Amino acid sequence: MEVAEPSCPTEEEEEEEEEEEQSAEPRPRTRSNPEGAEDRALGAQTSVGSRSEGEGEAASADDGTANPPGAGPKPWQVPPPAPEVQVRTPRVNCPEKVIICLDLSEEMALPKLESFNGSKTNALNVSQKMIEMFVRTKHKIDKSHEFALVVVNDDTAWLSGLTSDPRELCSCLYDLETASCSTFNLEGLFSLIQQKTELPVTENVQTIPPPYVVRTILVYSRPPCQPQFSLTEPMKKMFQCPYFFFDVVYIHNGADEKEEEMSWKDMFAFMGSLDTKGTSYKYEVALAGPALELHNCMAKLLAHPLQRPCQSHASYSLLEEDDEATEVEATV
């Protein structure tokens, strides 16, 4: 009785098996390929501050979240567009045209903030001091920066034109009075900014630095109210421009009244919805808190808009208190 011998693989089959094993084996860790980085899936990587890595043109990514039926936005809110624009621009310290918009509502005169010596002061006095410190510090960093002052009550007024001399802006910063405001004309504010400034245009967003950038800093404090605003086509282009930034410091009462239709959180979220690029900074400070909070917020706005990371990735701690948090945060 003959026993069948097990079939031996041919030379061709052995070569195919060796090729499959080599293709499945990851590349060795070399100096040009540390930790096998080139073999990792690119889609699983997340870049910190990818908005301004210095390469890549403005791109858009679809937002997969859909609103549930019947849960539409409130009438006073501006719904963000479906595609979220992600901007990548060169990280350069080009000149800034900073337009500081100061709210002059009567809430700014309420002595609720706690000053450094423990006494009570109002938000207007603190805002005036922190604006002057901001302008003078930015001027020391780069003397080509220009500044303008706009006051906001029921209407908007352009008090100081764009100037590189901090003394010109500070000369009209302190002779201001608050007033009772019934509405907030946000549309008029942006229309005034469009009239007074011109946004730069470059041939290639990814490689050519702009001659300057335009940044608006709104220091706002009043009860939540329906702003007068409609997103026109020129305003939409302004917000989508990679060289325009809209920073907000919102001073609120810190309490939500049940009988009110809106809360300060709704108003703060509305301000944030205007930034479709994710490049602006938004801060909220309680009116009854310490004045130091306001100064800290203004100090964080000293960074150049093209050189700072996204706000969610920014960290201002010098000590690594939380190892896990510091791994995903970019220290400024």
Curated annotation (Swiss-Prot):
Residues 70-83 have a biased composition (Pro residues). It is found in: Cytoplasm; Nucleus. This is BRISC and BRCA1-A complex member 1. InterPro entries: BABAM1 (IPR026126), vWFA_dom_sf (IPR036465). The lineage of its organism: Eukaryota, Metazoa, Chordata, Craniata, Vertebrata. Belongs to the BABAM1 family. The VWFA-like region is similar to the VWFA domain. Its presence reveals similarities between the structure of the 19S proteasome and the BRCA1-A complexes. It comes from Bos taurus. Residues 10-23 have a biased composition (Acidic residues). The modification N-acetylmethionine is found at M1. The gene is BABAM1. The keyword NAD does not apply. Residues 1-88 are annotated as: Disordered. Component of the ARISC complex, at least composed of UIMC1/RAP80, ABRAXAS1, BRCC3/BRCC36, BABAM2 and BABAM1/NBA1. Component of the BRCA1-A complex, at least composed of BRCA1, BARD1, UIMC1/RAP80, ABRAXAS1, BRCC3/BRCC36, BABAM2 and BABAM1/NBA1. In the BRCA1-A complex, interacts directly with ABRAXAS1 and BABAM2. Component of the BRISC complex, at least composed of ABRAXAS2, BRCC3/BRCC36, BABAM2 and BABAM1/NBA1. Identified in a complex with SHMT2 and the other subunits of the BRISC complex. The keyword DNA damage applies. GO terms for biological process: cell division; DNA repair-dependent chromatin remodeling; double-strand break repair; mitotic G2 DNA damage checkpoint signaling; positive regulation of DNA repair; response to ionizing radiation. Component of the BRCA1-A complex, a complex that specifically recognizes 'Lys-63'-linked ubiquitinated histones H2A and H2AX at DNA lesions sites, leading to target the BRCA1-BARD1 heterodimer to sites of DNA damage at double-strand breaks (DSBs). The BRCA1-A complex also possesses deubiquitinase activity that specifically removes 'Lys-63'-linked ubiquitin on histones H2A and H2AX. In the BRCA1-A complex, it is required for the complex integrity and its localization at DSBs. Keywords: Acetylation, Cell cycle, Cell division, Chromatin regulator, Cytoplasm, DNA damage, DNA repair, Mitosis, Nucleus, Phosphoprotein, Ubl conjugation pathway.
